[in-house]
Amino acid sequence: MTRATLQQVLRPCLSDGTAVVGLVVLGWEDARAYVRAAEAENRPVILQAGPGCRAHTPLPVLGAMFCYLAETATVPVVSHLDHGEDIHICRLAIDCGFTSVMYDGSALSLEDNIARTSDVAHMARSFGVGVEAELGVVGYADGAASTGTDPAQVARFWRDTGVDALAISVGNLHLMQSSGAPIDQARIRDIAAAAPGLPLVLHGGSGIAPDLRRTLARTNVCKFNIGTDLRQAFGAALRAALNRDPARFDRIALLSETEDPVTDAARAAIRSCR
């Protein structure tokens, strides 16, 4: 299957009432499990390399891994840079084969966010690469607060940047270990009304209950980022493997026991968005 772009997998969601998952990758084992899950569900998938992943594994290595998985998959696979800090990391990702980049200027003023996002979007478009941006800070369950997305700013932001997708702050939080995020559905409706046709993204998808994901997928929310649920599945499987035989030490044998549980968790995430 040819590597897919962000536009190719998100645009159909606006009309068919579904969403695509952006799954946070930390290594080969989970990336492979995510693709197998997508193939089993016959759905597209977005493989995401966030700051933590990039601190552990260089982008050229991640790019090669994502490209290999995409080119050998039977479903569309998007290689996505998550939370790019500046235009330089976005350009490096493109040079490494990524088909989608996110520039996160949410902590900046509106004017600076528009200006820098526009620069990234202009650069990425010249390579046929999709761009996600963020308007309004999405906070963390264990720290930084959210600022919320102002619906009154959305139309101008989209008009002036031309991004392919917009991450919004509506009560969602990164790193929630259980569902229950206080999602402001009225604000989502206001944002969608301000920019009809713009695919919206919710980071912190693990904090959003599966039934609510299904409901939100029938709006303009076309992408849910999910990581914590999958890391929890990986950690539980690895602990169980070690506890069964504390003397085990073979890395490949141990990690192989995480693949089925992570695949199952990824399949559940994919099913929750349609």
What are these regions (language model features)?
Residues M1:
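Conserved oxyanion/phosphate-binding beta-strand-loop segments in alpha/beta enzyme cores
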Residues G136, G205, D229:
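An acidic- and aromatic-residue-enriched active-site/binding cleft used to recognize and process polar
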Residues H80, E132-E134, V201, A269:
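Generic enzyme active-site microenvironment
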